[in-house]
């Protein structure tokens, strides 16, 4: 982009607040010369951090927020007291046209509720979904929902498939992404009622999707399909299990390579490769909330400045991807696919 891109950031969100968020903005700014920042939070604290980062002040506007939404607040509480908080300000800047995309490391449920209230849903969608990018040998798998919606009926899963396919097409340049529905087996009769009904709708609904049916957990890292769809409960558990496994493997590998003098010498020689391995296995820096009339990304609450800088770079990429129009085009087919006149599930599917 030749014109300036504005990223609105909740500077108080997450476990560390401005002491991490502001240096992260400075780190990301070095790679994003066309980006400006709106930082929302306690003005004195944020400005003090900005002053420590050379060159950041010229590209940053600080907007004062009196309050912060706690990481343990319920979404209903966050909505009641949201105005005047740093998270509210970061999202509201999108609606007001002051920024192109918002980033927060704050409370996930609160961010979803506030974003939905302020920005509203697009194209008759019901709920936003959090999406993650899972690395595999051939590229990445787009995985959703990873925590925004614990309970999902068949219609929600179909919406997620449409959103995920459009996102993968725009974000990763794949002309016709393949889509799979996460299940406990690939057979048609497997799984609970909601996932079987979603499978039927996706097969018979006339969507412009390359739908491949059910996939299993190991398909996430095999690259069997481009997009894997599930409910937020299952997705969040799977994502965190993969993150934990990656940390365990890296720790064990590092311990084995430093167990003795000769292996330590080998570890020193292998250090660049080990760092690349750790980078490759690191969890995604941020998860976009898909389906809103505006772009919002959720960063890990415990992210350090390096991880938050990655989230900011991801926000810049998403803001330039243009996937919203792809979602809207396929959503027009959804009401007909959900019609009672549509064929019923095959007999014996249990």
UniProtKB/Swiss-Prot annotation:
Its EC number is 2.3.1.274. The keyword Repeat does not apply. It is found in: Cytoplasm. InterPro entries: FA_synthesis, Phospholipid_synth_PlsX-like. Its main location: cytoplasm. It catalyses: a fatty acyl-[ACP] + phosphate = an acyl phosphate + holo-[ACP]. GO terms for molecular function: phosphate:acyl-[acyl carrier protein] acyltransferase activity. It is an enzyme of class 2 (transferase). GO terms for biological process: fatty acid biosynthetic process; phospholipid biosynthetic process. One of its GO terms (cellular component) is cytoplasm. It holds the Pfam family FA_synthesis. Keywords: Cytoplasm, Lipid biosynthesis, Lipid metabolism, Phospholipid biosynthesis, Phospholipid metabolism, Transferase. Pathway: Lipid metabolism; phospholipid metabolism. Belongs to the PlsX family. PANTHER family: FATTY ACID/PHOSPHOLIPID SYNTHESIS PROTEIN PLSX, PHOSPHATE ACYLTRANSFERASE. Catalyzes the reversible formation of acyl-phosphate (acyl-PO(4)) from acyl-[acyl-carrier-protein] (acyl-ACP). This enzyme utilizes acyl-ACP as fatty acyl donor, but not acyl-CoA. Homodimer. Probably interacts with PlsY. This is Phosphate acyltransferase.
């Amino acid at each position: 982009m030749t014109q300036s891109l504005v990223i609105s950031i909740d500077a108080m969100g997450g476990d560390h607040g401005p002491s991490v968020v502001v240096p992260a903005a400075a780190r990301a700014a070095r790679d994003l010369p066309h980006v400006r920042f709106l930082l929302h939070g306690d003005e004195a604290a944020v400005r003090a951090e900005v002053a420590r980062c050379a060159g950041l002040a010229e590209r940053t506007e600080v907007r004062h927020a009196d309050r912060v939404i706690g990481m343990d607040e319920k979404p209903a509480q966050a909505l009641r007291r949201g105005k005047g908080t740093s998270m509210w300000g970061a999202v509201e800047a999108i609606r007001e046209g002051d920024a192109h995309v918002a980033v927060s490391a704050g409370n996930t449920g609160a961010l979803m509720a506030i974003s939905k209230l302020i920005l509203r849903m697009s194209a008759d969608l019901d709920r936003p979904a959090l999406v993650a990018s899972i690395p595999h040998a051939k590229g990445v798998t787009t995985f959703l929902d990873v925590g925004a919606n614990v309970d999902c009926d068949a219609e929600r899963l179909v919406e997620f498939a449409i959103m995920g396919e459009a996102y993968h097409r725009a974000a990763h340049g794949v002309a016709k992404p393949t889509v799979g529905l996460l299940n406990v087996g690939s057979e048609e009769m497997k799984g609970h009622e909601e996932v079987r009904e979603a499978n039927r709708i996706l097969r018979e609904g006339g969507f412009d999707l390359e739908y491949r049916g059910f996939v299993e957990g190991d398909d996430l890292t095999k690259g069997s399909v481009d997009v894997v769809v599930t409910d937020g409960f299952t997705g969040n558990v799977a994502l965190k299990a993969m993150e934990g496994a990656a940390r365990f493997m890296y720790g064990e590998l590092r311990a084995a390579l430093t167990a003795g003098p000769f292996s330590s010498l080998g570890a020193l020689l292998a250090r660049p490769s080990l760092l690349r391995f750790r980078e490759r296995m690191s969890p995604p820096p941020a998860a976009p909330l898909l389906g809103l009339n505006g772009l919002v990304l959720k960063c890990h609450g415990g992210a350090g400045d390096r991880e938050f800088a990655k989230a900011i770079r991801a926000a810049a990429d998403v803001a330039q991807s243009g996937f919203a129009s792809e979602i809207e085009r396929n959503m027009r087919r959804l009401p007909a696919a959900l019609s009672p006149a549509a064929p019923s599930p095959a007999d014996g599917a249990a």
